[in-house]
């Protein structure tokens, strides 16, 4: 199997800085599908949460660059995923330690998609999302939020994030890849004003056939949600399986 992929992260028109981070990397080895797409959304109520998002982005990129020469000749799929799990937990502890040592609150969500030959693997913390688009739009991550009542109104709060506690709790799942599927990893800035029917129609009409076209679809979606009034940072990774 092969894939086409695009990755974008923008500040948007209202926020003073971009607290999101996104990355997408893939193996250059012939006949090997090994790729990662990751989006981290810094918690807006914490003034310096881009530090946490940057830690995750850099950590995942370093992990991939370390594993790419080894897979599949010198490390199998199970060992590779175990190593990634351990790396994510170490990054979480790094953020938690930074908070304690510097006396500041930072944190971020993390939605990470790993493609390994004929399977996908999800590592997820927080309320960013990963959608799978085939003959419909399906969310394959769970929003880790809690609903509380304040001043007589229901309010949604983030229940889990990278750096919240020293010992990370993380959602994981796996599935089989099918040619024609599209994965969209994104921060809540991408999804809050994006209707499923519009997303489905865009994916079907555009029929991505290159990395450039994948990025063009992301640009289109980001432009659309900004026009719809989105004020948050917006980040996404789009991957089509062929």
Residue ranges and their predicted role:
Residues 1-242:
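PP2C/PPM-type serine/threonine phosphatase catalytic domain
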């Amino acid at each position: 199997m092969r894939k086409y992929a695009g990755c974008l992260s923008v500040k948007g028109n209202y926020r003073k800085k971009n607290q999101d981070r996104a990355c997408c990397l893939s193996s250059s080895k012939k006949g090997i599908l090994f790729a990662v797409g990751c989006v981290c959304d810094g918690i807006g109520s914490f003034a310096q949460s881009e530090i946490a998002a940057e830690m995750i982005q850099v950590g995942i990129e370093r992990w991939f660059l370390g594993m790419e020469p080894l897979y599949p000749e010198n490390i199998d799929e199970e060992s590779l995923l175990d190593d990634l799990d351990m790396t994510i937990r170490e990054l979480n502890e790094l953020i938690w330690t930074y908070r304690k040592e510097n006396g500041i609150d930072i944190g971020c969500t993390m939605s990470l998609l790993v493609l390994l030959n004929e399977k996908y693997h999800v590592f997820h913390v927080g309320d960013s999302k990963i959608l799978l688009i085939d003959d419909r739009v399906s969310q394959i991550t769970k929003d880790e939020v809690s609903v509380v009542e304040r001043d007589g109104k229901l309010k949604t709060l983030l229940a889990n994030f990278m750096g919240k506690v020293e010992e990370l709790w993380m959602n994981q799942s796996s599935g089989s890849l099918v040619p024609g599927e599209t994965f969209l990893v994104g921060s809540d800035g991408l999804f809050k004003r994006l209707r499923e029917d519009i997303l489905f129609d865009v994916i079907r009409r555009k029929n991505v056939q290159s990395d450039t076209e994948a990025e063009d679809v992301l640009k289109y979606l980001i432009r659309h949600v900004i026009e719809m009034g989105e004020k948050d940072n917006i980040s996404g990774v789009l991957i089509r399986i062929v």
